[in-house]
Regions:
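Conserved active-site alpha-helix within GNAT-family acetyltransferase domains
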Residues: 102, 128-146
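Conserved acetyl-CoA pyrophosphate-binding loop and the N-cap/start of the following alpha-helix
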Residues: 95, 99-107
Length: 165
């Protein structure tokens, strides 16, 4: 079952979306902060802990994607054994500035309750320099609880979204 607002929906990745996702581009200022969508699909093939989620527009066309990761890697970001790690969030460059990021993240609670009912939190790491992403995550309910870690290109803020059952 898909989670949707009428305008967008979140769905688990299927091969039928691959061709469109591989055409995604990102502006240069965003590339440093997230994974290339094609690379994410490749990594997820060999890593069963990376659950790729596709963001579809109202026509069912992929406009973005992200991963919800389970397993040991999550514990690098939180002590919560029942948390998921959100990684590799991106919206195709030519579909940005249309509200897809905010709308898709607003569906995250419902998606996690449906597909990961035993999980009670989503965590993510956002670079301190990536102010637009920090603001977006705060708007949809993620909280900065003061945890920091060093990432590949600098200090990262660990943000937490409690999943309310």
């Amino acid at each position: 079952m898909n989670i949707h607002t009428g305008e967008i929906q979140l769905v688990p990745y299927k091969e039928k979306y691959k061709e469109v996702i591989q055409t995604f581009t990102l502006p240069s200022e965003q590339v440093q902060f997230t994974s290339d969508p094609g690379e994410l699909l490749e990594k997820a093939k060999s890593d069963r802990t990376k659950n790729v989620i596709v963001i579809l527009d109202y026509n069912g066309v992929p406009v973005g994607l992200f991963a919800l990761q389970t397993g040991d890697r999550v514990q690098e970001f939180t002590d919560n054994q029942d948390a998921l790690l959100l990684t590799s969030f991106s919206i195709n460059h030519n579909r940005q500035r249309k509200g897809y990021s905010k709308k898709s993240l607003a569906l995250l609670q419902e998606f996690v309750l449906r597909y990961f009912p035993m999980k009670n939190e989503v965590v993510l790491a956002v670079n301190e320099k990536n102010i637009p992403a920090q603001n977006l995550y705060e708007k949809v309910g993620f909280q900065d609880q003061g945890f920091r870690r060093m990432g590949p290109i600098g200090q990262q803020i660990i943000m937490h979204l409690p999943i309310i059952k």
